Amino acid sequence: MSVQHFTDENSATSYPVGDRSISADHQQWVCTTCGYNMIGEMPDICSFCGATHDKFVAWDEAEKIYRVTPHRVNDYVTQLLSLPRLGFEHAAYRIETEAGAVWIDCPSAFNRDLQPIEAIYFTHKDFLGASNQYRELWAAKVHLHALDARIPIAKPFPVDRPFEGDFTERGIEAFHIGGHSPGFTMYIYRKVLFICDYAFPPGSTMQLNPFGPQKETRDRAPRILEVISERSLETVCGYNFITEFDSWREDFKHLLDRAKSA
C-alpha cells in the first residue's frame, strides 16, 4: 500500500446525551486555522493554536461549509476528512466492529447527517473535535485517558469513560503509551494500527512528534515497538496518512535507533 496523504476529508455522565438535536442557542466556535472547537462564549484567541477570533466560525456555519467525507481504507475502516480542509486538519477513523460502529478520534466539523456511531475512542486530547456535539446527537460514549481528561484544554468536553492503562473492547485493543501527551493511547483493530501523530511522516524522514514534551515522547516510543514488533498487521492509520505496516514499522525502528545515538 502506498502512502496516502490527504489534501482537502473527569467523568461527565451528568451531561445530557442522545437528544438527536443541537440547540440553536448552543455556543461553540471552530478555529479555521487548526480546527479546534471552543465551547461557550467566543474567546479572543484559540487556546490550541493562538489564532485570533477573526479566524473563528460558529459551529452551525462550519457545518454548512465543511463536509465530513468518508474515504474507504478497507472493508471495516473508513477515514473521515473535512472538505474543504479545515485548518491543519486531522483524520478520524470509523471502525465497523461486530459490536457496532465506533470512531477513533473525532472530526472537527459537526455534520448531523453522518452515519451514527456508538462510541468514540481518543488517542489523546488534541483531537477532541466536535465530540461533545456528536455525543449529544447519538448518545455516543466518549473514551479518553484520565491523564488527558484532566488537562485544561480537554475539561470543557464531556468524557464518559476516563480510562487508565490498556484495555480491549469491541475487539479494539488500546495501549497506553504516554509521551506526546500524558494519556496518549494507540489502538489496534484486526489488521490496522491507529497511531495518530506520535511519529510522522511515513518514510525515511519520519520523526517523533516535535510538539509537546520531547524527552517523554522519545522515552515512551519504545513501548510502541514492543507492542507491534511481533504483530502481523497490514495498515497504519495516522493523523494525515495511511500507509503499509511493514515499511512503517521498519521506518519506526530506524527512527528509534537514530534517537538512541543522538
Predicted features and spans:
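A broadly conserved sequence feature marking short terminus-proximal activation segments
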Residues: 1-27
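Metallo-beta-lactamase
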Residues: 19-44, 52-55, 101-102, 150, ...
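Short Cys/His-rich micro-motifs in 6-15 aa windows
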Residues: 49-61
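Conserved beta-strand hairpin/beta-sheet module of binuclear metal-dependent hydrolase folds
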Residues: 64-110, 185-201
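Active-site-proximal loop/helix segment associated with metal-binding centers of metalloenzymes
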Residues: 83-90, 146-147, 152-156, 202-212
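Active-site HxH/HxHxD metal-binding segment of metal-dependent hydrolases
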Residues: 85, 107-169, 256-258
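Short amphipathic alpha-helical segments and helix-helix/interface helices
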Residues: 92, 110-112, 131-135, 221-228
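A general structural motif
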Residues: 99, 116-117, 139, 232-234
